[in-house]
């Protein structure tokens, strides 16, 4: 088997050259990181769950007309994606006060926000991904005003879809992070959703118990991250009740 050419390696994923021009292979690692990799642990099976959950969500977004980079799943850890030029921004959509928003503004965690709030963060680990305004984004050329409008429109559509989807399986979408990229097709360019959407990039709380089913279990040393991700996958119908993700550790089995 020929050795694949690695294009990029991040904290939780590796990108390899794809089989056709304009494609990449996105590989999900088992690494769990927080606070820009200051905290790090390998949790066996996490990459499999994130791959399958992100695949499920991106395929549904494609189906309702929200453009994403996702083409198809290749195996348990990898998916074929369209190659895009990543906009160097993290787009955070908040529905409920939590995390840094609660700390910055002194709002009690769990407080429902008056409306969904969209925030932008400059993707730069050395600077700890600082929060930026639209003025910063356009002044430094990270995105044009039209691209910002397109990104915000996508963020609202993704939020509406995810909120309803998770509500239907007893999960509250507190907030989520997404990234966008520029897809070049012939002479045209359009903004599409890229990266991943998974419990790594969302805050997901059980509606009844407020139990955290996301990466806060790792950030806050709550334990049970793999079990929480498995529970999300089961509720989405991705895993059967007693199915075990390939290469994973213990899996939650409901009594």
UniProtKB/Swiss-Prot annotation:
PROSITE patterns registered for this protein in UniProt: SAICAR_SYNTHETASE_1 (PS01057)
Gene Ontology cellular component annotations, sorted alphabetically: cytosol
Catalytic activity, as annotated: 5-amino-1-(5-phospho-D-ribosyl)imidazole-4-carboxylate + L-aspartate + ATP = (2S)-2-[5-amino-1-(5-phospho-beta-D-ribosyl)imidazole-4-carboxamido]succinate + ADP + phosphate + 2 H(+)
Class in the EC hierarchy, top level: ligase
GO molecular function: ATP binding; phosphoribosylaminoimidazolesuccinocarboxamide synthase activity
Top-level division of the source organism's lineage: Bacteria
Keyword terms, alphabetized: ATP-binding, Ligase, Nucleotide-binding, Purine biosynthesis
Keyword Protease part of the UniProt annotation: no
Listed name of the protein: Phosphoribosylaminoimidazole-succinocarboxamide synthase A
């Amino acid at each position: 088997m020929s050795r694949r050419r690695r294009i990029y390696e991040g904290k939780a994923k590796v990108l390899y050259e794809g089989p056709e021009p304009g494609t990449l292979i996105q590989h999900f690692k088992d690494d769990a990181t927080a606070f820009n990799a200051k905290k790090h642990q390998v949790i066996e099976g996490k990459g499999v769950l994130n791959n399958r959950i992100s695949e499920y969500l991106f395929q549904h977004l494609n189906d309702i007309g929200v453009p994403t980079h996702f083409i198809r799943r290749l195996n348990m850890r990898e998916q074929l994606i369209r190659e895009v030029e990543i906009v160097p921004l993290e787009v955070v959509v908040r529905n409920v006060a939590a995390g840094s928003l609660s700390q910055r503004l002194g709002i009690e965690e769990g407080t429902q926000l008056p409306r969904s709030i969209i925030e932008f963060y400059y993707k730069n680990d050395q600077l700890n991904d600082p929060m930026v305004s639209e003025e910063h984004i356009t002044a430094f050329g990270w995105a044009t005003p039209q691209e910002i409008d397109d990104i915000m429109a996508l963020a609202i559509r993704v939020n509406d879809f995810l909120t309803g989807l998770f509500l239907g399986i007893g999960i509250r979408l507190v907030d989520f992070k997404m990234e966008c990229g520029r897809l070049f097709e012939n002479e045209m360019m359009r903004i599409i959703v890229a990266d991943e959407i998974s419990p790594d990039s969302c805050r997901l709380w059980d509606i009844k118990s407020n139990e955290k089913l996301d990466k806060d279990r790792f950030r806050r040393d709550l334990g049970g991250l793999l079990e929480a991700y498995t529970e999300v996958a089961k509720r989405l119908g991705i895993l059967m009740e007693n199915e075990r993700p390939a290469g994973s550790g213990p899996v939650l089995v409901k009594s």
